[in-house]
Amino acid sequence: MSEKHIVVTGGAGYIGSLLTAHLLRLGHRVTVIDNLLFGGESLLTFFSDPNFYFSKADVTEKRSLRDSLPRNVPKPDTVIHLAGIVGFPACQAIGKQATWHYNVEATQNIYEQAAGLGVERFLYASTYSVYAPSTDGGPVNEESPLKPESLYAESKIAAEEYLRSQSGPAPVLFRLATVYGIAPRTRFDLVVNQFVLDAFTRRELLIYQRGYSRSFIHVLDVARGLALGLDAPLEKARGQVYNLGSDEGNYTKDQIVALIIKRLPEIIVEYKNLTFGGDKRDITVSFDKIRRELGFTATLTVDDGVRELVSALKTGLIRNPYDERYRNAHFIVQ
């Protein structure tokens, strides 16, 4: 793998901070653009690395990419666009106009700047929430019908459609499974992480939609999967969509609870057969394409994620895990 100059928008976030570390380990030059909405402590460890550069900027600004690039270094080869408002609760909290501004218009803005700079490829983080459940109950794949059931998913589809219509930098789209695991900026508003936190601190869990299936992926494996998009043959990769996860990561909520009970057997679990909130996903996803075309296989399991989360909480490595900064929607509306 040859050294590349890669721009990561949202690089101080949950996925971005681990992706930055992974890219630096691979020998790449990394420029992170982030407005530091959730703080910048996740980036501090990189500042002594000569291949790391940081710019505080908002991706909605017209020259945010152009003005963020370090001087006297080659132009970027790739932009990995992670920045935006992530998750249906956060998007609901700020409304459609703001969601479109940050998730659709900002994507267009960064892509247009990348095109003007002669960037070769543009990797985009989307979500598997865009799918409708299959009619036969089987797993959905990249060709399955789209049926967004949240404002967040709607905004991701709109951004995807824009990117796939462009002729500039080759867009490569990754529809991420639900992420879990520890990172420099951990989130506790995601299913596995939130379940473990509530089980550990409250010794009880209240579970809605117990039999609903979802697909899960460890945040470290997300970083690995995105990095595989850097070396896919350019013309073959252009406009491709990849579900990013693994078949082994398809779990029901009941199965996740069983993994938690294995490590916290004293907890009390209460089930309610209600459809609760705005996120009604009950879906199984196929990840054959990313395994076949990019060679991706997950290295960590949901059980690994539960283990590391319990350990981090028991040892006090995460102080005040109920702080709003660990939850996208709560922090944004403060």
What is each PLM-predicted segment?
Residues 203, 207-334:
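C-terminal substrate-binding subdomain of Rossmann-fold SDR/epimerase-dehydratase oxidoreductases
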Residues 136, 149, 161-214, 219-230, ...:
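NAD(P)-dependent short-chain dehydrogenase/reductase
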Residues 48, 57, 184-188, 249, ...:
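Residue-level signature of the cytosolic catalytic core of signaling kinases
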Residues 18, 94, 113, 134, ...:
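Generic structural signal for alpha-helix termini and adjacent loop/cap motifs
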Residues 1-170, 175:
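N-terminal Rossmann-like NAD(P)+-binding domain of SDR-like oxidoreductases, especially those catalyzing
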Residues 151, 155, 188, 253, ...:
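Conserved donor sugar-nucleotide recognition element shared by glycan-biosynthetic enzymes
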